[in-house]
Amino acid sequence: KREKSFDCTECGKSFKRKSKLKTHFLCHTGEKPFVCVHCGKGFRDNYKLSLHLRIHTGENLSVCPDCGKSYTDKNKLIVHMRIHTGEKFMCSECGKGFSDFYNLKSHLQIH
């Protein structure tokens, strides 16, 4: 049995769930319906808002043992730790290394 997919009419990206498509579509409209009651910052989904709220409450923050910088998302701390370890995100095309994943992602567009 083939799974039904929900395709974005703007960019063609496919999703297995209609709710994921609905959340994704907000990136095209710019709408951020989930708003922080403390500072007014908006988010496209409730999960991202719940992570953000940790900044205000201090709850479940992940703290870097080397410099003390704190993150609401443990994965962001793991990426941050590369600054201290020197570990790089490597380009599979040319071997160039980047300390920041988003810099690698931008770099990959030139290949």
Swiss-Prot record:
The record's section on SMART domains has: ZnF_C2H2
InterPro entries hit by this protein: Znf_C2H2_sf, Znf_C2H2_type
Classify the source by domain of life.
Eukaryota
Zn-finger (C2H2-type) residues: 6-28, 34-56, 62-84, 89-111
The cellular location(s) given in this protein's UniProt record come to:
Nucleus
Gene Ontology CC entries for this record: chromatin; PcG protein complex; transcription regulator complex
Q: Name one Pfam family in it.
A: zf-C2H2
The answer to whether the entry has keyword Membrane is: no
Record keywords, A-Z: DNA-binding, Metal-binding, Nucleus, Repeat, Transcription, Transcription regulation, Zinc, Zinc-finger
- Output one GO MF annotation: zinc ion binding
Q: What does this protein do?
A: May be involved in transcriptional regulation.
Q: Which family does it belong to?
A: Belongs to the krueppel C2H2-type zinc-finger protein family.
| PANTHER family the record matches | TRANSCRIPTIONAL REPRESSOR PROTEIN YY (PTHR14003), ZINC FINGER PROTEIN 143 (PTHR14003:SF23)
Protein name, as recorded? Gastrula zinc finger protein XlCGF32.1
Native source species = Xenopus laevis (African clawed frog)
